[in-house]
Each structure stands twice: as C-alpha cells, then as structure tokens.
C-alpha cells in the first residue's frame, strides 16, 4: 500500500488538510520566487515548488512526516530529487530533518515566531531606508494604483490580487535596497513567514487593515518622509506577528490586527 506523502502523526489523521488551489498557489510561488528561478527549472526545482505549495497552502497544524518515497511517486520523479527538494526546504526553515525519523513538517513555536518577525522587522526597515533614495516615484504610484484596485474589490475577497499587492510592495523595497546579503537573508525568512501571509487572506478585515498600512507607507515615501515610512513598516510587521501568535497560540497581550 502506498504511503501518503504527508503522513499523519501518532495523534490522528490528516483529515483537515486544505485542498490546494493550483492557480493561486502557482501565482503566489511565482510572485515570491519567480525572479530567482532558473531559466530552465530542474527536476529538483519542480519538486521543491510542489512541496512548498503543499506546505504553505495546508491548514494542517500538526507535526507530520514527509515521505520522500511517497512524494517522489506522487510528483512523478525519482527519490533523489524529491529528497534534495526536502533538504532545500530544511535550509529554508519549513521542514526539519531527524537522522532517525526522516523529514517532518516544521512546527513553529511562539519563540520561533517572535524571532522570525523581529528579525524581519529589523531587516525590512533597514531595506526601506537603503531603498528610499533609489525608489522611482512612478513605481510607488503604480503600487498605490494596485492597492486601490484591491480595496475596491475587497467584498469579493480577491485573494490573488491582495497577495500580489502585498508581496510586490515588500519585494520592491527589499530589492531596491541594493544590498545582496540583506536580500538573501530576507529571502530565506520569507520562506517561513509567507505561509502566514497566505493564511491572512482568510480574514477580510486583516486584508483591509494591511492595505491601510501599505497606503500610509507609500504616501510617506512619496512625501519624502523616510522616518515615518520606516516607523509605519515596523508597526505593520509587529501587527502581523501579533496576528500569527494569536492565531496559532492564542497568546494573550497580542492585539489583533483587525478593525472592529
């Protein structure tokens, strides 16, 4: 009998896993990693993308084993590229490897979330400050136009368009920093916090609040007020951290990033 690529832990069955919207998951992956893709993707690249989408778009929050044999069979590849893809995901922080028990979906602790988002906040604020003098006002206005388009459609819950708007602003600021090492570190962090960004689309009020934050950041940058933009970005990321902690751990003292 063939094993499931994601095996249930001893506590129960994998019965609540979300069915992946292939179009949306492909768009999200392309938005995040399209600029880093090889011109001709390898078999490992393909396996990595498919497993990444499975992890990011799953609602399951239990520790589960990832079978390289079953994944290889499901994806139509040999075991070696499936294993190499899992090893890459270990480096990205989405999977953990146990020498005796194989590969497992990483379960984030509250301390992990604090560390990820605190580091993200510090690095993205630095990226904004480095990027600000180089930013083209036309790019900022284009981002505002996209934001207003998303806002007009909020009642329709435009998941894809919202994520596009969200990822594009952060990517614009990070890449415009011109600091290769900073971009590299944030790319690795993004592998970890992107799954929480995707899950935020389940909360329309959070999407609305995030758009409000983005608008204020963009207007501050267009007005040449870099200090204000940096302060707003830091608060935006702190709110995102509070939401993740409240969602996963019900941590008290974390204000919800939702409007009443």
Predicted regions and their residues:
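Mobile beta-alpha loop/short-helix "lid" or hinge segments that flank ligand
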Residues: 91-96, 189-191, 206-208
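C-terminal all-alpha effector/ligand-binding and dimerization domain
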Residues: 2-24, 39, 146-151, 156, ...
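Short helix-capping/hinge motifs at transmembrane helix termini and TM-loop junctions
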Residues: 132-133, 178, 202-203
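Residues at helix-coil transition
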Residues: 56-57, 178, 222-223
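Short, flexible turn/loop "capping" segments at secondary-structure junctions
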Residues: 64, 97, 166, 209-211
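Conserved amphipathic alpha-helical segments that form helical-bundle/coiled-coil interaction surfaces
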Residues: 116, 137-199, 211-219, 228-239
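Short linear motifs at protein or domain termini
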Residues: 1-133, 245-260
């Amino acid at each position: 009998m063939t094993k499931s690529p994601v095996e249930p832990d001893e506590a129960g069955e994998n019965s609540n896993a979300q069915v992946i919207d292939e179009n949306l998951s492909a768009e999200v992956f392309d938005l995040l990693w399209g600029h880093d893709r090889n011109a001709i993707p390898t078999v490992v690249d393909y396996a990595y993308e498919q497993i990444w989408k499975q992890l990011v778009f799953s609602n399951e929050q239990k520790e589960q084993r990832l079978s390289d044999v079953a994944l290889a069979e499901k994806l139509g590849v040999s075991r070696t590229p499936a294993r190499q893809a899992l090893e890459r995901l270990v480096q990205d922080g989405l999977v953990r490897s146990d020498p005796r028990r194989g590969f497992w979906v990483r379960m984030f602790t509250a301390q992990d979330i604090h560390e990820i988002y605190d580091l993200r906040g510090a690095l993205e604020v630095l990226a904004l400050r480095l990027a600000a003098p180089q930013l083209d006002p036309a790019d900022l206005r284009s981002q505002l136009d996209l934001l207003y388009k998303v806002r007009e459609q909020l009642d329709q819950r435009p998941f894809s368009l919202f994520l596009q708007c969200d990822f594009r602003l952060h990517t614009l600021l990070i890449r415009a920093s011109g600091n290769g090492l900073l971009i590299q570190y944030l790319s690795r962090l993004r592998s970890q916090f992107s799954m929480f960004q995707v899950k935020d689309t389940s909360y329309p009020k959070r999407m609305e609040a995030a758009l409000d934050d983005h608008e204020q950041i963009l207007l501050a940058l267009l007005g040449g007020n870099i200090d204000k933009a940096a302060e707003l970005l830091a608060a935006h990321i702190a709110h995102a951290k509070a939401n993740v902690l409240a969602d996963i751990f019900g941590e008290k003292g974390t204000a919800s990033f939702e409007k009443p």
